[in-house]
Amino acid sequence: MKRMLALVLLASLAAGCSHTRECHCRAYQKKYRRPLTGTAWQLIQLYGQNVPPEKGVFTVTLSPEEGRISGSGACNRLSGDYAADETRALKIGPLRTTRMACPELEQEQKFVEALTTTTHYDMDGPMLMLLCNGELRAVLQAVPEPNEK
């Protein structure tokens, strides 16, 4: 009987430990994860290269009601349509952009290309990863709300 009680207590302890780890992950996701739509996303990595703010601030926001995307590159604004579903499929475009010349125009064109070739997305905490057939194209970070700074 003591042996059975010891096994039950050990099993309960093990279950409690694994549950605790799971809760930490969920707490992280709950605290930092942002919804795909209605969140301002800022580009931090493009085709495997970090994008420092001095290279320009690249942002997008996906509107939940209208299926519209809007944002900006280093010097131009962009807008267009998008479609997303529960399987994390994401199609962006066609996009329209203003046509101002700027020093970071090549980077801006790569940003637009990454957006329009996106087939899927993934999310981890405050990060949004844009993928094209499984290949990572861009990583964006949720722009903090004014009360989060």
Residue positions per predicted region:
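Lipid interaction determinants
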Residues: C17-K149
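Sec-dependent bacterial lipoprotein signal peptides
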Residues: M1-A15
